[in-house]
Design a protein with these regions (language model features):
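Glycine-rich, flexible beta-strand/loop modules in the N-terminal catalytic cores of phosphate-handling
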Residues: 26, 34-111, 201, 205-219, ...
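Glycine-rich, charged/polar anion/phosphate-binding loops
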Residues: 20-23, 29-32, 50-53, 103-105, ...
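Short, Gly/Pro- and small/polar-rich lid/capping loops
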Residues: 1-37
């Protein structure tokens, strides 16, 4: 599919990702960690493994993977309040999405009765914080599980595949990949795709923020998303090499 020439930040094409950098092992005490950078968006992802599972999971002889998400106060242009007991609905929605996404590629029986918590802290936000979180969280999770294998606590890494996420949208009538904040803040259509390395979708979130969209536009957005996911999956592999 051909895309119209549009004027985007950094001279990006409509179907081009922002510069993406995935840096592993950035935290000394985490079992696995990754700094995920999508342009000016930066998310610190840290995975910790603990013995035992939530009470409702006991007796299942299977593990659990969960996530927490938060934005640091100075991560945006205007200071956002630090979250304490009163969690923001948006943050809770995103951390549930991260947890769901990761669980789809974990063999819980092979994990055994361990709980993995992946903390995703946004240190700088410029759009796409949830997609950067998921992409970096998978690497942090993978490295934490690999550490447990090396320690003799697991026989093998209980992963069935990779997971990455990317945003798509319609801005000023143009179908775009990987929106930054300036684009996302006035997008007519906003969409997020979470998918595996085999191309299977885990979650698709799409909203006509300012205008409805038809099946043709949806297909174009999905084509962009597939392209972005494939590139992110390859970047994850390169980070592991």
């Amino acid at each position: 599919m051909e895309y119209m020439q549009v004027n985007r930040a950094n001279g990006r094409a409509a179907n081009e990702l922002r510069p993406v950098k995935l840096t592993r092992g950035v935290m000394k005490h985490a079992h696995g960690s990754c700094l995920a950078e999508f342009g000016d968006t930066r998310v610190l992802c840290a995975a910790t493994i603990e013995e035992g599972v939530p009470g409702w999971r006991k007796g299942a002889k299977a593990g659990w993977v969960t996530a927490e998400y938060a934005m640091l106060p100075a991560s945006t242009g205007k200071r956002c309040k630090r979250e304490h007991a009163n969690r923001k609905g948006r943050s809770m929605e995103i951390e549930r999405l991260i947890g769901r996404s990761l669980r789809t590629v974990v063999n819980m029986k092979a994990l055994g009765e361990y709980t993995v918590t992946v903390d995703c802290d946004v240190i700088q936000a410029d759009g796409g914080t949830r997609t950067a979180s998921i992409t970096g969280a998978w690497l942090a999770l993978r490295d934490a599980l690999a550490m447990w294998v090396e320690a003799g606590k697991l026989e093998r890494i209980p992963l069935t595949g990779q997971v990455a996420a990317i945003s798509m949208g319609v801005v000023d009538g143009n179908t775009l990949l990987d929106l930054d904040y300036s684009e996302d803040s006035h997008a007519e259509v906003d969409m997020n795709l979470v998918a595996t390395d085999s191309g299977e979708m885990i979650e698709l979130q799409g909203t006509g923020e300012q205008a409805p969209f038809d099946r043709k536009r949806l297909n174009a957005l999905l084509d962009l998303g597939d392209k972005g996911i494939a590139e992110l999956i390859e970047l994850q592999r390169q980070a592991l090499a």
